[in-house]
């Protein structure tokens, strides 16, 4: 097989449907043992034993998890919101909603967590942000 350039790959992806792309991503993840989750910057932890009192005693939390506690009676609307927030497929979003309580988003900024909480609550779900 000839080596494809990045541009040729992008052109090929543009011709695929979302369902085909979703299947491709799953196969890619399985083949290479990776996930398509967005990378999150990790702050370096201070050395054990401490080098003095440089770190504040209580740091403000900057990463939040959005937990779907319960669905309510508008299950279809909640599934639609979960799909919009996570770009999961229909089956995966339904499984997540059916398995509540479960995290919908993990390690996101406060603004994104609040926006997701508002969207899910607007669809009728009960949500907590941790």
From Swiss-Prot:
Keywords: Ribonucleoprotein, Ribosomal protein. CDD domains: Ribosomal_L7_L12. Disulfide bonds: none annotated. It comes from the Bacteria. One of its GO terms (cellular component) is cytosolic large ribosomal subunit. One of its GO terms (molecular function) is mRNA binding. One of its GO terms (biological process) is translation. InterPro entries: Ribosomal_bL12, Ribosomal_bL12_C, Ribosomal_bL12_C/ClpS-like, Ribosomal_bL12_oligo, Ribosomal_bL12_oligo_N_sf. Belongs to the bacterial ribosomal protein bL12 family. HAMAP family: Ribosomal_bL12. NCBIfam families: L12 (TIGR00855). Homodimer. Part of the ribosomal stalk of the 50S ribosomal subunit. Forms a multimeric L10(L12)X complex, where L10 forms an elongated spine to which 2 to 4 L12 dimers bind in a sequential fashion. Binds GTP-bound translation factors. Forms part of the ribosomal stalk which helps the ribosome interact with GTP-bound translation factors. Is thus essential for accurate translation. This is Large ribosomal subunit protein bL12. The lineage of its organism: Bacteria, Bacillati, Actinomycetota, Actinomycetes, Frankiales.
